[in-house]
C-alpha cells in the first residue's frame, strides 16, 4: 500500500486502485491497468481541494479507507469495493471492474478535399464525408464497472432521454449526445448516494439479465466519484461541489424553443430572432 496525505493506492485483482478523499462525503476512485494517470478533466472543476483527514489500513485480504462520513473497503483478490457509512452500514457494492485495451482513432481526410454526400432523412438533411480514413491517436481502454444493487433499490439520473424512464432498474440505457438526448454520467440511488463518472465518451447503463454494470467506450482509466450525500439534496450539493455551480444561460437561450435541425447562415438566425422579438414572442 502507498499512502500519502491525499490518497492511498494498492494493487487488487491485477489492477491499480487509488482512493482519494475529496471531502468527508466524497471519495474519488481511480482504477488503472498499468498506471494511474493524471487527467485534465472536462467535467470536474479545476480548483484546489483542501486536504481531508482519513485513516487507511491494509491486510492480506482488504484495504480500508475511512473518513468521518464514508468507509471504503476494497477486497484485494477481486477488486470489489463496499461503500459504507462510517458506522459500517452499507450503501452499495462496486462488484468488479475490467479494462480492455483498444486503439483510439480519429477520422481524417489526410489533407484531401472532403467529398460530401448530402442525404435527406426523416431528421432533416445529413452530410456524410465519404473519404474519411481512420488514424490511430493513442492506446486507450474500454471499461465496465459492475454494481451489486439491493433488490428494492431505485436508480435515477443519467441525464435527459426520450423514453421517459424514471427508475432505471431492469433497463438498458445508452448515454450519447443527440438532438433530444442530454446524457449525464451520474446516477443517484434511493439508498442515499450518487456516483459520478469522469467520462466523456459513449456510455451504456445495463441492469438487464444477471449482471448490472456501466460500460465506458473509450477511457484512459476508470475514474469515478462516490458521493455519500444521504439525501438527494446532499448528493446534488456534492455534485455541484465537484462540477461547479449551475450557470445562468444567456438571454437568447430562454423563451420560445424551436424544433429545428439547423440554420444555414448567421443572417438567417438573426432574422428569426428579430422577427420573434418584433411580434412579442419572448
Predicted regions mapped to residue ranges:
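N-terminal accessory segment at the very beginning of proteins
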Residues: 1-253, 258-274
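Short, intrinsically disordered, charge-balanced linker/junction segments flanking boundaries
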Residues: 278-282
